[in-house]
């Protein structure tokens, strides 16, 4: 570090707290989700049938509950995880869709974002787990004692690897899709042949539509795996 005559630092990079594109997209997605679910919540408070956007959201909420939460966590424990599962599902889906807009803000293509989501899943899993969860890791029932000593570190390593697998899976799938689309768009300006341009344009359009499906699919996979981790943490001891 260098100082001037008054002992003020001259080569220190100032702390930058400006709002980046990713932060703006996350804030916008959070606001949209708040407004959407506020409408649905108000209809439930007054025992009314959901209207407008609520009609679209209600089947999706039921889908997450009946097809993801209950089968993987169980009816006894799923309710305390529902709010997080719904948040993760709709948040990832929405920011994936925003990444397909002309704004081009690919939030889930940023590994820091997927790391934060995976870290939250990991922390909730560990903090809400039962004693049987750790028993199956460090002292597995039905396994000879010498093997338990060998398998315990492997099981512990598996626990630590899970959030990284969750992080990389979401990041890589979204990033790869955007790279392919941007590469095809770039080829439109490389070729002078109108036939080639038309072919690449059609392929780009097809992949862009396919990305709409991928946006929902990746949200589903992340939520499903999260529910599986929660289910393993609260599983009852059957031995």
Spans of features found by a protein language model:
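Selective transmembrane helix interface/packing segments
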Residues: 1-239
């Amino acid at each position: 570090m260098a100082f001037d005559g008054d002992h003020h630092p001259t080569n220190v990079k100032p702390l930058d707290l400006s709002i980046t594109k990713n932060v703006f997209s996350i804030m916008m997605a959070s606001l949209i989700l708040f407004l959407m679910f506020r409408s649905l919540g108000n209809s439930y408070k007054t025992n009314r049938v959901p209207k407008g956007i609520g009609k679209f959201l209600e089947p999706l909420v039921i889908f997450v509950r009946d097809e993801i939460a209950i089968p993987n966590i169980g009816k006894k424990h799923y309710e305390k995880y529902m709010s997080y599962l719904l948040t993760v599902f709709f948040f990832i889906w929405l920011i994936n869709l925003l990444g397909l807009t002309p704004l081009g803000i690919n939030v889930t293509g940023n590994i820091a974002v997927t790391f934060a989501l995976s870290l939250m899943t990991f922390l909730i899993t560990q903090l809400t787990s039962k004693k049987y969860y750790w028993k199956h890791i460090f002292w597995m029932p039905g396994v000879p004692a010498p093997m338990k000593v060998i398998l315990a570190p492997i099981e512990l390593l598996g626990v630590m690897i899970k959030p990284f697998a969750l992080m990389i899976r979401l990041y890589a799938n979204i990033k790869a899709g955007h790279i392919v689309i941007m590469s095809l768009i770039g080829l439109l300006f490389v070729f002078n042949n109108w036939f080639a341009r038309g072919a690449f344009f059609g392929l780009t359009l097809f992949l862009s539509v396919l990305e709409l499906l991928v946006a929902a699919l990746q949200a589903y996979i992340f939520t499903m795996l999260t529910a599986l981790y929660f289910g393993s943490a609260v599983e009852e001891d059957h031995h």
